[in-house]
Amino acid sequence: MIDTSIPLVDLHRHLDGNVRVNTIWELGHQHGIALPADSLETLAPFVQIQGKETSLVAFLKKLDWMVGVLADLDAVKRVAYENVADAALSGLDYAELRFSPYYMAMNHKLPIEGVVEAVVDGVKAGLKDYNVKINLIGILSRSFGQAACTQELEGLLAHKQHLVAMDLAGDEMGFPGELFNDHFKRVRDADLAITAHAGEAAGSQSMWQAIQELGATRIGHGVNAIHDPKLMEYLAKHRIGIESCPTSNLHTSTVASYAEHPFRTFMDAGVLINLNTDDPGVSAIDINHEYRIAKAELKLTDAELAQVQRNGVEMAFLSDSDRKALYAAKV
């Protein structure tokens, strides 16, 4: 099902959405943070999706517990390190870990730039111990408004040499992309690539805006593109990558069922699309799960899954030489 001759990548993976249950438990007790359960076993349902529960509100509450225990910068560094370990242990050859330093900092009033430094340090430490290639993507969390995103941008740009791209995430309906055009001009001026969560809660116009005004060359989720034939044609022609996360889309009620997921529609239209985990800690999945779902529920053939793997390598924010090195390591 997964072709071992092709690099396995995960490009849409939130570092702050992948905190281990035992880490939440340990950090909560270490810092005297009240947790919603009195044992490690009973904590899991509060921080991970159980069964077929599908609600955006419930999903976000679980996500909040993951950042709620980041009481100091050592905790941030630990979580970053464990993200590298988890990526390697799931069999990934390459992952792009994205994170929102404002969101990670807000509960315990940590310095935003300090959070960025701690993430970088944790990833560096992880790379010494695990054989996986990692790049970082900074997130501007639109839900907190323009001023907060400016603070976030400043903290991220102070360490731009450790980033490959910037992302816009959060409340797509309440905070449309045009509010952040100036922010992303600065991102482009810093020579960073751009991806954006768009077409998830809002319609195709949100995707057009992200591409034409923010400068996005990849789109996170993008499920609503299928209602706009001109956009689908544009995506295919210009090789705009769709970072698809089927299980997450089900868990957040972005789609009602796997049967209604538009992954197949994108593939049939010739759109560049790959498989990703989104918030693997909340969804309690790994990349292997997404490939199993793609075969069993989305009805992709092994040949199509191999193409999805190749798409991921093409979409990655990598130099041509790094891309070739990923393939060379599989020989």
Swiss-Prot record:
Gene field: add
The organism of origin for this protein: Shewanella baltica (strain OS223)
Spans traversing the lipid bilayer: none
Protein name in the entry: Adenosine deaminase
Binding residue positions for Zn(2+): H12, H14, H197, D278
Gene Ontology molecular function: any one: 2'-deoxyadenosine deaminase activity
Residues under site feature: Important for catalytic activity: H221
Source organism, top-level taxon: Bacteria
Cofactors, names only: Zn(2+)
